[in-house]
């Protein structure tokens, strides 16, 4: 049985969306147990009772403006912190939260702990593409500054995730840069390019420009955290703007516009599905001793369900356990 600890109080739509997502997951998957951390009364108002769902009551929760390090030290009874402690103590196998990203990163590092040999765990997310296959990108903001060694490790981590969780036999790895030529980029990108080219354990396809990301040019995209986060927000914002503008044009148009939209309904639905991040799951702080997954702050029921499904796959494939073994081998070789 896979045991998943969930911060029921994190996110814009908590606890309603969180609990209703849990209800759907419990019905869909018979091999999971959920531990919900938060206000018992509020949780119970949405929960469909099940012997595979436990509520661990606490009145304390992490706020959106809490400073990460201080919150971990001072709010020891917060729902997010208690969920992470359950993982550390072996009472749960993974943690999910839609709450404060910075605090979750701190909780992941200080409570759950990083895998020996991993210098900087990276925030990894699967982003939809026009091909429908998506790509994994990291770092998406766990670290504002990185070295070439960090980015090289992200390529290894991303490839490992793509192989074991998404089932891609030989993931193509691209380096996000301001041009495709190998001479392009700042010193960080140039040094990273050399390391990736020299590593024959990964399938490096070279530099990738931001405009190529959505076409599925690579299965894994590597970036420093600052740039990666900015690109992710741009993709999300563009997708939301496109769908919003289409809706506005259709609603404000005449009868011909509405008839045309009706005829294109299935195509527009497929387009929306392609741009919809909610079905892709959450962002994994990959490189820790257990799955620590950040669901989007505005997650709805579908997004929470998808994140639970994602974590279930991670536990089913034992991707973290395999990663621990992989880095243990590398550490022995380097020693």
UniProtKB/Swiss-Prot annotation:
GO terms for biological process: fatty acid biosynthetic process; phospholipid biosynthetic process. Pathway: Lipid metabolism; phospholipid metabolism. Its EC number is 2.3.1.274. It holds the Pfam family FA_synthesis. The keyword Thylakoid does not apply. It is found in: Cytoplasm. It comes from the Bacteria. Belongs to the PlsX family. Catalyzes the reversible formation of acyl-phosphate (acyl-PO(4)) from acyl-[acyl-carrier-protein] (acyl-ACP). This enzyme utilizes acyl-ACP as fatty acyl donor, but not acyl-CoA. This is Phosphate acyltransferase. It comes from Streptococcus pyogenes serotype M18 (strain MGAS8232). The gene is plsX.
